Amino acid sequence: MNLKILFVCACLWMAVLVFGSSRNATWGEEPVPAPTPPMGWNSWDAYGESVKESDIRASAEWMAKNLKPFGWEYVVVDSGWYVTNHSAGFNAQNADFSLDAFGRYTPAANTIPSAKEGTGFRPLAEYVHSLGLKFGLHILRGIPKEAVAKRLPIQGSQFHAQDAADTADTCPWNPFNYGLDTAKPAAQAYYDSLARQFADWQVDFVKVDCISSHPYKGDEIRLLSQALKRTGRPIVLSLSPGPAPLDKADEMARYAQMWRISDDQWDVWQSSEAFPQGVNNQLERAAQWAAHSRPGNWPDADMLAIGRLEPAPGWGEPRASRLTRDEQRTLLTLWSIFRSPLIMGGNLQLCDEWTKSLLTNAEVIAVDQHSKGNRAVETTNNSALWLAEPETGAGYYVAVFNRSDEPQTLRYAWKALGLKEQEYSVRDLWEHKELGSAAELRVTLRAHGSVLYAIRPFLNP
């Protein structure tokens, strides 16, 4: 071979190696799922179990037009998509289901009409993909009780549903399924068949419920994770509900990309009788979990209960979010400095300009998507202080929270944040405004208010 050709080939190969080394994965390695916190919309907070295909399509269209340029991409259908008689009520004992011949839930054709020909969610997923977005769904861990009662075969195996089921294990707040007996090969076979179904439907995101708390089911997490990986399709695995046990953080990180750190987060400032979770209460939980955030692993503070929670929210009456505007900014500020997944819960079709402004602030989103070293510096009963750094470039991100029911002025020396004592230039990321230089951090906040700043060492001209 001509030496010149050999030289050119060698140069090209070196370029490939250098380029490959700069990516999330190198040759021979799998790409990291969810390298940044997932961003999207989930149907639960607005529609509960009543969501219809027309709602999903319209929400996806709105997201593609208004939110996609800012990084929002997942459209997730939450609980109940396989229930054919929603009038029976939430998690009703007399619910009727749509099942295939292998004991797997399929979309109810009366609410997801594109599934009528046995195509499942594939037509809807393809439509969502055509908009440049990704498609997700919610499942309950385990196997349908109806599949066990009918002794249905498990696709791709010699087993039947009763071989996989642990009939002594039912989710304490949803009676639809039995848990799986993870000591039996049939359990893995069932989750394998479920994962193949999802891959065939072109699913990109699976939220699995009753698995990370109430109770924690580590073996089922492992089996489902293995099943999804075997499909060869990159599918984000999101674990619910919370609070996930902190001592299981490393185990969850091996098998999932997201896990809930609290009970359901709704539009309340303070928890009442432990449910739902209040925004204020997330400050302690986020502080505990911050060290466990990394590419592919994101402790999840739950959905953003902002905007219009209607027509049939999963908790409470139809309403506008009860969080004040200050509390809504505080929610987004905490979620971003903590690097939680950002999953909008409100009705996108009814999204007002204020809510849209919260979801399309590129400077705030950049903190969530591209920061490092995120940590709580101080958490007291009346305030909280967080610090992070941009992934690239100089400076820091600083968030200050007023947890008090009264306005207050908070002052911190820069050394209290572990920073060098000097002047820093300060930019307000919510207001897109330069605030000048400061020899200390001093903020005056309304009740439940917050600020999110970018700071850099001040250089005199």
Describe the role of every protein-language-model region:
Residues 64-210:
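Aromatic-lined carbohydrate-binding/catalytic grooves of carbohydrate-active enzymes
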